[in-house]
Amino acid sequence: NELIEPSGSNDVVTALSENVQRIVAAGGLASINHPNYKWAFGYSQLVKVSGYRFIEVYNGHHLSNSEGDLERPSVSNIWDQLLTSGKKILGLAVDDSHNYHEIGPDLSNPGRGWIQVQVNQLSKNSILQAMSQGNYYASTGVELGELVLNKKQIRLEIDESATKQPNE
């Protein structure tokens, strides 16, 4: 619950590294958020930064550039490159909502992306621990009903009644 002062560096890698170190030192889980927003940073910078556990693979804000463009890769592709390089980073989806009273495709409305965390107790520590262990999934609409994962099987059921349909 302490304020973490941001790095004062103008160098992207240095600023990201210092910010990640400060977040981790304060007991937090560091995430790289909307890396394609204003094309802020990509694989060549992120591969040089250590200590972050998550990358925002999907951001529901219409200006986040999550999908990339003809010249720049999507955040999913950047994530794939980071995983291929050996980094163990988990993906997140968020809505990045800023607009709550008016709904529209060019507005940053809630519910476009989220994570669903599997916990036995609704507490800050339980949620942080589950996220750190990867006991969550990121979604832009699908809700899971049951997930069974063991040495004999992997079974996934989608809760169709709770799953958002496009344009809902």
Question: Which residue ranges define each predicted feature?
Answer:
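Domain-core and long-helix interface of multi-subunit machines
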Residues: 7-108, 145, 149-156
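C-terminal functional module detector
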Residues: 85-90, 97-168
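Active-site neighborhood of divalent metal-dependent phosphoester/pyrophosphate hydrolases
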Residues: 1-7, 57-60, 117-121
